[in-house]
UniProtKB/Swiss-Prot annotation:
Listed Gene3D superfamilies: P-loop containing nucleotide triphosphate hydrolases, RecF/RecN/SMC, N-terminal domain
GO cellular component terms, A-Z: cytoplasm
Superkingdom: Bacteria
Residues annotated as binding ATP: G30, N31, N32, A33, Q34, G35, K36, T37
GO MF annotations in UniProt: ATP binding; single-stranded DNA binding
Family, as annotated: Belongs to the RecF family.
InterPro entries: DNA-binding_RecF (IPR001238), DNA-binding_RecF_CS (IPR018078), P-loop_NTPase (IPR027417), RecF/RecN/SMC_N (IPR003395), RecF_2 (IPR042174)
Annotated PROSITE patterns: RECF_1, RECF_2
Origin species: Clostridium botulinum (strain Okra / Type B1)
Keyword DNA-binding set for record: yes
Keywords from the UniProt entry: ATP-binding, Cytoplasm, DNA damage, DNA repair, DNA replication, DNA-binding, Nucleotide-binding, SOS response
Gene that this polypeptide is encoded by: recF
PANTHER family listed in its UniProt record: DNA REPLICATION AND REPAIR PROTEIN RECF
Protein name: DNA replication and repair protein RecF
Amino acid sequence: MYIKNVHLINFRNYDDMYLELSPNTNIFVGNNAQGKTNILESIYYSSIGKSHRTNKDKDLIKWDKNNTYLRTYVSRERLDKTIDINIFKNGKKAITVNKIKIKKISELMGNLNVVMFSPEDLRIIKDSPGNRRKFLDIELCKINNVYYHDLVQYNKILSERNTALKNWNNKINDIIDIYDEQLSKYGAFIIKERNKYLDKLNIIGKNIHKKITNDLEDINFRYLTNIKDFDNTEKELLIVLKKNRKKDLERNSTSIGPHRDDFEVSINNIDTRIFGSQGQQRTAVLTLKFASLEIIKNIIGEYPVLLLDDVLSELDSNRQKFVLNSIDKIQTIITCTGIEEIDKYLDKKQSQLYLVNNGKIKRV
């Protein structure tokens, strides 16, 4: 899988930009705030229907325009895909794939698979459990439409349950019983799929991490949940929800479920979030991203597109070398402010360089 070309109109700081891409390595070089990340953002949006930088679609529209247009042409082994997206300031958007209208975001996912690595991804390791849940949810939604559906349903019912808790009376108690059954059904599936994904990360990620660290470190991922019996997840989740209802009523929120879960990343049996060095935390994220590439490849039969947003400068020479030696079969799109540090690791025959300046791109 690779992107042949991208066409952007009124997207961020681009007026009308058409770009042909190499199926191998593409490097966009320029100073900060020139539009490098905007290119990656448009590709990411074409993949999952949302930005990695903002929750407001109107932020993507050039400040003095009423709409933006994105077209991404994707070469696939079986059938090429043309993804067209129109986003309007009034909040509406229209998406087609090969001229067929997309009614749900789940229908968009899977046409263009990407894995993005940006400096903000360090939050996966360093920050709150919400960042780790978000990572799992995004990766699973890319490859599992049922997961996407059940996650949407779970969040909808969770919101309704929390509203009911705030307006509790004896009649509402019966309604909460119904919510608990629905949450248990969808929540059990989410918990099981997250746990299975981490099992895959353990199998694939351990080898990747050993390569990066020259066999000096062993990495492990472990799902953290109140559910102990994964063979009876739905039943156990229902029991725990009922058990915690009094506490939930006092707090006006649901205290148990996959929306509260987490996963632990340990290196040599030490919690990386608390005790890991910054270098170890970066390596752990690198492992997560490259393991995700392999998981997608194993499921769909071809590698996704890799987006590296100004991260190579954050890595030491050993990690830079690992990244650039691992992308020969993967279309990779890199942004950076200069290539001096990574130039010696680049395969010049497989690399295409672009200069970015104030929303203008020049192929070198």
